[in-house]
From Swiss-Prot:
NCBIfam families: NAPRTase, PRK05321.1. It catalyses: nicotinate + 5-phospho-alpha-D-ribose 1-diphosphate + ATP + H2O = nicotinate beta-D-ribonucleotide + ADP + phosphate + diphosphate. Transiently phosphorylated on a His residue during the reaction cycle. Phosphorylation strongly increases the affinity for substrates and increases the rate of nicotinate D-ribonucleotide production. Dephosphorylation regenerates the low-affinity form of the enzyme, leading to product release. This is Nicotinate phosphoribosyltransferase. InterPro entries: N/Namide_PRibTrfase, NAPRTase_N, Nic_PRibTrfase, Nic_PRibTrfase-Fam, Nicotinate_pribotase-like_C. It is an enzyme of class 6 (ligase).
């Protein structure tokens, strides 16, 4: 494994991002080339990152020097034949322009504290790749600024113990169908931590590890790149078509765009119940499976099985992919629960590349992974929303749009949730200390 958890430069390859970003970029370039969007970076952790602004900004600005090499272009063509070759060739000319697209601020919160804020604005097709890249930059800047003393051996020992325990449990429980992919890019401790982890897992768990969501590391380590679509695809459609039709249109156009090659549907942009109303027989047959990213995984899985059965579809011909903040133990329990009833697979992130166990610094402060997100907040000047199956994950900057969206999808209007959103919007009001 690695002897150093940090590199002198965080992003060293144009491919150091999650696979689904370039999938969506391809679809956006083909279908919505003129769409304008805005994204916002939000810190969910109770940790002030404002002092990291200069270093984060410096790393983001370095992206202007990153380009797709001919070797990388040819690699994408080889592993992603579902992408339009003309689109992939056009990546030769793609350039990040963070000076134009990305803004950095320090905000004063309602309680008087400060927090780092990052906004991304521009053409959807030109700004779509920033999300996972900027998140990985923030995470690593925070790690090397505040946790540089964490010994490599701490990370290694925690990972090795997890693998030992997993092997023991697989044998004890006689589980033979456990499959998972690495999805840690956005919230990794560092690039080197993710790289080291993948090298170790590919050696120790070759029959369980299906691949990684990171294109660069998939290429370097000979792993399968894993990824389909994210919430922003569905959120953008809320502003591009009639809002009530947005989810179904997004599903239909995605299916048509890739001829079924990227057939895992994300279910919780509006919520599982609203999703099932749109996921009709044609779509249920066309998509090979669905992905869970919020709410109770067991309740969700039972609903999906019941849905397939109601349409006369054998659930064993479909795959449920679970990606909501999992560790090995949680994934094993889900795997056992649905064994022989439906195919299952897992995406695991923070637990793999950002777990330091019980490590604490000299002041006795225990290490905790950073909780951060970047989400689309508007498309073509109109607000968009993610409702989610977990209220804490809901995102929308316009309370009236959220209420209308819920009404159109026949979702219950929770007054406490609405009050919480209003409080959050007030707390995140545009009160800047620094406009960098």
């Amino acid at each position: 494994m690695t002897t150093n958890l940090f590199s002198s430069r965080i992003i060293q390859s144009a491919l150091d991002f999650d696979v689904y970003k370039v999938n969506m970029m391809s679809a956006v370039a083909a279908l919505y080339p003129d769409a304008m969007v805005s994204y916002k970076f939000i810190v969910r952790s109770e940790e002030d990152l404002s002092e990291l602004l200069p270093e984060v900004k410096a790393e983001v600005l370095k992206l202007q020097d990153i380009t797709f090499s001919t070797e990388e272009i040819e690699y994408i063509k080889g592993v992603a034949p579902y992408l339009n070759p003309e689109f992939v060739d056009a990546l030769h000319a793609f350039r990040f322009n963070p000076q134009r697209d990305v803004s950095f601020n320090i905000k004063t919160m309602a309680d008087g504290t400060s927090q780092l804020r990052i906004t991304i604005n521009g053409l959807w097709k030109e700004t779509i790749l920033y999300e996972t890249i900027i998140m990985s930059i923030v995470s690593e800047v925070r790690s090397r600024a505040r946790w540089a003393e964490v010994p490599v051996e701490q990370f290694q020992s925690v990972l090795e113990e997890k693998v030992r325990h997993l092997k023991t449990e697989l044998k004890r429980r006689n589980i033979t169908n456990f499959k998972f992919a690495d999805m840690s890019t956005r919230r990794r401790f560092s690039f080197q931590a993710q790289r080291s982890m993948l090298k170790y897992l590919s050696k120790e768990l070759p029959d369980c590890l299906t691949g990684t969501s990171n294109y660069h590391l998939a290429k370097e380590l000979g792993l399968t790149p894993i990824g389909t679509v994210a919430h922003e695809w569905f959120m953008g459609h809320q502003a591009l078509v009639n809002v009530r039709d947005s989810q179904k249109v997004a599903l239909q156009r995605w299916q048509k765009m890739f001829n079924g090659a990227l057939g895992i549907a994300l279910t919780d942009t509006i919520g599982i119940d609203a999703f099932l109303k749109d996921f009709d027989e044609e779509l249920s047959n066309a998509y090979v499976g669905v992905r869970h990213d919020s709410g109770c995984p067991y309740t969700w899985g039972e609903k999906m099985i019941e849905h397939y059965q109601s349409l006369g579809i054998d659930p064993m011909t479909k795959t449920l992919v679970f990606t909501d903040g999992l560790n090995f133990e949680q994934a094993l329990a889900i795997c056992e629960h649905f064994q022989d009833r439906v195919q299952v697979s897992f995406g695991i992130g923070t637990s793999l590349a950002n777990d330091m166990g019980d490590y604490a610094n000299a002041q006795g402060i225990a290490y905790k992974p950073l909780s951060i997100v970047i989400k689309m907040v508007s498309c073509n000047g109109s607000p968009v929303a993610k409702i989610s199956d977990e209220p804490e994950k809901a995102m929308c900057e316009d309370i009236f749009f959220l209420m209308n969206l819920k009404r159109r999808f026949e979702q219950p209007l929770d007054l406490d949730e609405c009050r919480g959103l209003i409080d959050r919007l007030e707390d995140e009001g545009d009160n800047y200390l620094i406009d960098a």
